């Protein structure tokens, strides 16, 4: 086993300063280190387009290149930065690359980076209002701004024109957390409603989602203690463009109720990961209301598009759901991690998650006039996430953010038209936002004579494309068929990147088919 080398000669190149006091926040060092870090970031964004999107490294490569044990003695920061450049960057998958089309984007911006940097420097831990009033109030303000941009009902806002509302929001790390905390709240409400003593009735609770729902939902259900046998995955098909069919949902919920189970929670998705399908929010809410089940809307990706009036209809009926989450870190120029969860009645959430140890008690919390965000999440500690979201909205404004969304959608439309213009390919599902699902169609050539052959041809096309380093695309399975996903939205992408990727796809396909 490896061990810490305490021999000073092993690190003779990095001598420790004799008699120097350790000052990790020395003002001169902070300025020097951050200047170098900012220069690195700026250079990275200038050069990332020329880097292979996918790295050519093997598992364990980094331990072979860097020290297996931590150094005993100090090293100049320049040495640390040199190792970052020489060893870490070559092993990165470059999500910031304009040639990255594989997954939903992790967008970023100068304002978000600055906000995240400042929040990290302040390093506040705003678990209660008193622990950092500005951190809590900034988060509340940013969430209410975003709620207005999304035209959410005031019932989801922390503050209304009449003062503090009954609803509100919290910024979490991921959609997984948003689903987990709302599942816990729904679970507890259903247990109370069914007259169960504690968790004794947990085995009777049932939850529902379409088979296109993100896997994180099914994971969160297990974490919340739901019996896997009662987690319903409702089949979808081409007849509903792979969105959840309210009639099938009603059938499943009614069958469970008739069997003595308690329908507890329904997850509707606006913009599924596989194909960008949209579940009909209003109709789903109407079905769930028959059983007093909690309805959550997962709009992690496509929720950002709903700041544009032309996409807002995808949230119609949201006033009848219990919670909704969306992730600005996907498509709203705000770096990871930033998932915004809104609930119509915060008391239902805090009732399940509240903790009040003696050492956290204070007059502000006891007054009921403030929000203690620790009571809307799993943990207690939390980052100052609201700052970067506020800085993005304050710096760019609604119009620029809408322009960003519309530009990505327009570029996706360009790609969709290019695909439709080549009879070797087909667009598999309607393009609702900025994701195009396409494939080499069966019958396009000898290498794709049957549907099964076409599946293999598409798999080979994806692998060949990704090996070039010039583009990165991913796949999914829709209707039993292997499909390529082309997701537009990287912050540095322009139309010429989309067209270049298409030329590479055409060229590679021609080489394969011949």
From Swiss-Prot:
The keyword Lyase applies. It is an enzyme of class 4 (lyase). GO terms for biological process: serotonin biosynthetic process from tryptophan. Gene3D superfamilies: Aspartate Aminotransferase, domain 1 (3.90.1150.10), dopa decarboxylase, N-terminal domain (1.20.1340.10), Type I PLP-dependent aspartate aminotransferase-like (Major domain) (3.40.640.10). It holds the Pfam family Pyridoxal_deC. The active site is at residue 359. It catalyses: L-tryptophan + H(+) = tryptamine + CO2; 5-hydroxy-L-tryptophan + H(+) = serotonin + CO2. Its cofactor is pyridoxal 5'-phosphate. Changing residue 298 to A: Abolishes enzymatic activity. Changing residue 330 to A: Abolishes enzymatic activity. One of its GO terms (molecular function) is L-tryptophan decarboxylase activity. Pyridoxal 5'-phosphate binds at residues 175-176, 273, 380-381. The modification N6-(pyridoxal phosphate)lysine is found at residue 330. Serotonin binds at residues 104, 214. Keywords: Decarboxylase, Lyase, Pyridoxal phosphate, Serotonin biosynthesis. Its EC number is 4.1.1.28. Changing residue 361 to A: No effect on enzymatic activity. Belongs to the group II decarboxylase family. Involved in serotonin biosynthesis. Catalyzes the decarboxylation of L-tryptophan to produce tryptamine, which is converted to serotonin by tryptamine 5-hydroxylase. May play a major role in serotonin biosynthesis during senescence. Accumulation of serotonin attenuates leaf senescence. Catalyzes the decarboxylation of 5-hydroxy-L-tryptophan to produce serotonin. Forms homodimers. PANTHER family: GROUP II PYRIDOXAL-5-PHOSPHATE DECARBOXYLASE (PTHR11999), TRYPTOPHAN DECARBOXYLASE 1 (PTHR11999:SF157). This is Tryptophan decarboxylase 1. It comes from Oryza sativa subsp. japonica. The gene is TDC1.
């Amino acid at each position: 086993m490896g061990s810490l080398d305490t021999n000073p000669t092993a690190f003779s190149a990095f001598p420790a300063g004799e008699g120097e006091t350790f000052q990790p926040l020395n003002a001169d060092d902070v300025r020097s280190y951050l200047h170098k870090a900012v220069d690195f970031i700026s250079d990275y964004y200038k050069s990332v387009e020329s880097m292979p999107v996918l790295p050519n490294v093997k598992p364990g490569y980094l331990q072979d290149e860097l020290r297996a044990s931590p150094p005993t003695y100090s090293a100049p920061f320049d040495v640390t930065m040199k190792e970052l450049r020489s060893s870490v960057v070559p092993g990165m998958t470059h999500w910031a690359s304009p040639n990255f089309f594989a997954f939903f984007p992790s967008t970023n911006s100068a304002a978000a980076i600055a906000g995240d940097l400042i929040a990290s420097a302040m390093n506040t831990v705003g678990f209660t209002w008193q622990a950092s009033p500005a951190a809590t109030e900034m988060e509340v303000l940013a969430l209410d701004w975003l709620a207005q941009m999304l035209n959410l009902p005031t019932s989801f806002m922390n503050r209304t024109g009449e003062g503090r509302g009954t609803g509100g929001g919290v910024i979490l790390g991921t959609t997984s957390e948003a689903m987990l905390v709302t599942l816990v709240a729904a679970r507890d409400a259903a247990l109370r409603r069914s007259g169960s003593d504690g968790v004794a009735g947990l085995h009777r609770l049932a939850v529902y989602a379409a088979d296109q729902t993100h896997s994180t939902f099914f994971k969160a259900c297990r974490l919340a203690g739901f019996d896997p046998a009662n987690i319903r995955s409702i089949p979808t098909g081409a007849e509903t463009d792979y969105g959840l069919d309210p009639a099938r949902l009603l059938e499943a919920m009614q069958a469970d109720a008739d069997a003595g189970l308690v329908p507890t929670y329904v997850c509707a998705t606006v913009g599924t990961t596989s194909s960008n399908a949209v579940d009909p929010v209003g109709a789903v809410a109407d079905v769930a209301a028959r059983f007093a089940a909690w309805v959550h809307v997962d709009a992690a990706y496509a929720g950002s598009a709903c700041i544009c009036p032309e996409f807002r209809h995808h949230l119609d009926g949201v006033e009848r759901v219990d919670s909704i989450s969306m992730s600005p870190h996907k498509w709203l120029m705000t770096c990871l991690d930033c998932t915004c969860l809104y609930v119509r009645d915060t008391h239902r959430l805090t009732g399940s998650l509240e903790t009040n140890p003696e050492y956290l008690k204070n007059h502000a919390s006891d007054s009921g006039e403030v929000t203690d965000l620790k009571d809307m999440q799993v943990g207690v500690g939390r980052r100052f996430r609201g700052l970067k979201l506020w800085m993005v909205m304050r710096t760019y404004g609604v119009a620029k953010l809408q322009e960003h969304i519309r530009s990505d959608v327009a570029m996706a439309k360009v790609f969709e038209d290019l695909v439709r213009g080549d009879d070797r390919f087909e667009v598999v599902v309607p393009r609702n936002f900025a994701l195009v699902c396409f494939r080499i169609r069966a019958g396009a050539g000898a290498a794709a004579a049957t549907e099964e052959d076409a599946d293999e041809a598409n798999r080979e096309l994806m692998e060949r494309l990704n090996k070039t380093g010039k583009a990165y695309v991913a796949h999914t399975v829709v209707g039993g068929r292997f499909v390529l996903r082309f997701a537009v939205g990287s912050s540095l992408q322009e139309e010429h990147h989309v067209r270049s990727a298409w030329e590479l796809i055409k060229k590679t396909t021609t080489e394969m088919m011949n």
